[in-house]
Structure formats: structure tokens, C-alpha cells
């Protein structure tokens, strides 16, 4: 897989960084972080959007598509198989694809507070950035995608593997699902 620099427009709204690099959370689905990346598919650039639960680093929503836009983000949101009312905070970088009426409507409907990274500071969204880096290393670089359907199928398999079989050092070397299950037993 090949990569290239994609300069992006930024969201200039005056929204604070409410997350403020507090990446450890006490409850599942309390705080989600998100980011997008690009991947070569059959000679053209396509995009992947991930939503990650900070509690256990689980990928709870994902999508792939030809365009880096709000539709890609909303498709990832629609795949979240949890009660969205649990989410208190949604944090992203300042990418324009997250600044959209549809996304605003979802956040407002479920009373989810928006948080944005400081402009030009990837450390403010470090968990999402690290997850994307792992995905590129473990998944994207290992594959050659012929079409969007193949990317979507392989992404589904990767997310399943990532959540259920890949141990995380930040989770005492448990998988995201095992960590959450252990927490649910002790609560």
C-alpha cells in the first residue's frame, strides 16, 4: 500500500480541547476518539474512519469509502453497536469532515460534548493516531486492495481481530474485549 501527503482543511470553530490528553477513562463508551486515514485501492485513494472507545481502546465504529467527508464519518457512527446516550465526549482533530450539520445533529440529539485537538497538535488525539498507525502497519501495508468491497471486507476482519485477539500494553496485555469483559465482572 502506498501513502501520500493529503493537506486537509481544518475546522476553525472555537471548540475547546475538553479531553486535554486525559486518555484513560473509567467507563466503557464514556469518551470516543476518531480519526481518518487514506489507503490506495485499485490505483486511487480511499479513506478509512475509525471510532475508538478510550476505556478499552476498542474500535467501536468504522467505515471505508472513496471520499473523505461527513458521509464517511456518519457511516462509522451508524456502525457503533452501543447506546449512543452513554457517550459523554467525542474528540477529534480539526478535520473538516467532522465539521458537518449531520454530525452536529447526532451529537446534539444524544447530548454528546464535542472536543477538538489544538490545531496542528496530533498529540491531543494520540490514541486515535496510534490506532491508525497500528492499523497501517498491521493491516494496510500487508494488503493490496483491488476495490472498495475488498477493503470493506478486509477492514471488517481486521477490526474483529484488533478487538478480540490483539493484546494491548495499555490494557495489561489484554485484548479490548477481554479488558471490557473483566471490568464488567468486577463492577
Place the predicted regions along the sequence by residue.
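RNase H-like two-metal-ion nuclease catalytic core shared by retroviral integrases
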Residues: 8-10, 92-103, 114-136, 149-156, ...
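Mobile genetic element proteins and their domesticated derivatives, centered on retroelements
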Residues: 19, 35, 51, 57, ...
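An active-site-proximal beta-strand-loop segment
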Residues: 21, 25-60, 66-67
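Short small-residue beta-strand/loop micro-motif enriched in glycine and branched aliphatics
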Residues: 56-62, 115-117, 141-142
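C-terminal domain-tail junction helix/linker
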Residues: 108-112, 136-187
Amino acid at each position: 500500500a502506498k501513502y501520500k501527503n493529503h493537506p486537509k482543511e481544518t475546522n476553525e470553530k472555537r471548540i475547546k480541547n475538553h479531553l486535554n490528553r486525559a486518555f484513560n477513562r473509567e467507563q466503557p463508551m464514556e469518551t470516543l476518539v476518531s480519526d481518518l486515514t487514506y489507503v490506495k485501492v485499485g490505483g486511487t485513494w480511499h479513506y478509512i474512519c475509525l471510532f475508538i472507545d478510550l476505556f478499552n481502546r476498542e474500535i467501536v465504529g468504522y467505515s471505508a469509502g472513496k471520499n473523505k467527508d461527513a458521509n464517511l464519518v456518519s457511516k462509522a457512527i451508524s456502525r457503533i453497536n452501543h447506546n449512543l446516550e452513554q457517550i459523554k465526549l467525542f474528540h477529534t482533530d480539526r478535520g473538516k469532515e467532522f465539521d458537518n450539520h449531520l454530525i452536529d445533529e447526532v451529537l446534539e440529539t444524544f447530548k454528546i460534548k464535542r472536543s477538538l485537538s489544538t490545531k496542528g497538535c496530533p498529540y491531543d488525539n494520540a490514541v486515535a493516531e496510534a490506532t491508525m498507525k497500528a492499523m497501517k502497519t498491521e493491516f494496510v501495508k500487508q494488503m493490496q486492495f483491488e476495490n472498495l468491497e475488498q477493503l470493506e471486507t478486509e477492514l471488517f476482519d481486521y477490526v474483529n481481530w484488533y478487538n478480540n485477539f490483539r493484546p494491548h500494553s495499555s490494557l495489561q496485555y489484554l485484548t479490548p474485549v477481554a479488558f471490557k469483559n473483566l471490568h464488567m465482572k468486577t463492577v
